Amino acid sequence: MPELQFLGGVTLRDDRVPYDVAVVGAGPAGLAAAATAAAHGLSTVLLDEQAAPGGQIYRGIAASPLRDAGILDGDYWRGGSLVHAFRVSGATYVPEAAVWGVARREDGLYDVMLSRGTPGARQSRLVAARALIVAAGAHERPFAIPGWTLPGVLSVGAAQLLLKSSGQVPAGRAVLAGCGPLLWLLAAQYLKAGVAVDALLDTTPRGRYAEAASHALGFLTSDYFAKGLRLLREVRARVKVVEHVTALAAEGERALERVRYEANGVAATLDTDLLLLHQGIVPGVNLTSAMGCDHRWNEMQASFEPVRDAWGGTTLPNVFVAGDAGGIVGAEASEVQGHLAALAVANGLGRIDARTRDAEAAEPRRALARALRGRAFFDSLYRPPDAFRRPVGDTIVCRCEEITAAQVADAARRGCSGPNQMKAFLRCGMGPCQGRFCGLTVTELIARERGVSPAAVGYFRLRFPVTPLALGELAALPSTEEAEQAVVRTTGTH
């Protein structure tokens, strides 16, 4: 069998010998999908941008640097069994592999383009697969406030990754601001790690609990209730919590020096060395968008997500999305969705019939219903307020190109009707992040100026490569037979 040797000793099949399924992402959804697919006799390759399996939620699970396991909650440590199940499944694992493109061949196979290696010596190669499961996870929602580009301002997610992967915690004064479960979770983890959290500035709007009350029954009967109550009590007992914060700004000359905020109509400042911001996470849609999958606006979660069926199937044949990449559902539900997507692939490729697929999916579907119980309550309670999703004035929106909210709003008033036109007006979304930091904010600002829903505005039209790629690396990519034939057909017409 032809094989291709990568840097670091990882051996992959030649693109002429396809895998049955390629899984992108090694979080709970990807790990479960790969293990289930391999268990059904499918040749499976798991492509992971990180150095070790676990994704963001289980980052560092295979070799945690933390001496005190109690700093991270029990939900984190259960990821170890998921990683073990994957490792013994027989699936091929490719770490540090950034998937930057996917192309469908005329014969229905998918060419997955990935980059791997050390900085300055990366190589791009093709992996062919009959089916694709995208489990690329989520990223934090943009939280553009005045001064958020100052040194000393980070996201809560970035701070938690430092804690999980290297055991690093801040040494000076720290303030957390925003809304959502992760904000409170990090505060509790910091307290256990001995970090002094000076304040937690809660941006959850007044009256939001009343709005979420219609979903309270599901929440009260879920596992989230007891965990959430315990978390809130731990933090409130030891941290100054300021509720109903309606304005935030980071201030300082060359680095963060203080946080200015307004709550209940009263303005105040806090001197601090570190400000950690968070207002929820959103699906990572860059890959599925560039592939051409249909997407829709989720009003409750205020984000775009791929259109999927009950198995995670998208509008492209044999392409599935599992986990938070398809809509925020949490780690447990993501794992179950990975199982379901793999069962659908096994059925689609003829390894199991529909009756077997449905029988094996019965218990996972019950588990999925349990895992999603209470999710609607969180989505309603912690939906970020408009004021923090739609900044104004000189607040930087696009960090890559240093474009302000006022510039985006002005372009919209001058006739720019959507994010793709905005690229021509201001280059928003054309930097290295490809819209991850600004995409939703740009959409929301245009929607505000036009007086329409973000669904009517849409999102950036993304193209490959979806991650930064050196031109030399692209030029060295081995050509496929289809690409060579395309050149022959083109040159033959002249």
Segments the model singles out, each with a brief description of its role:
Residues P2-P432, R436-H494:
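Residues forming the flavin
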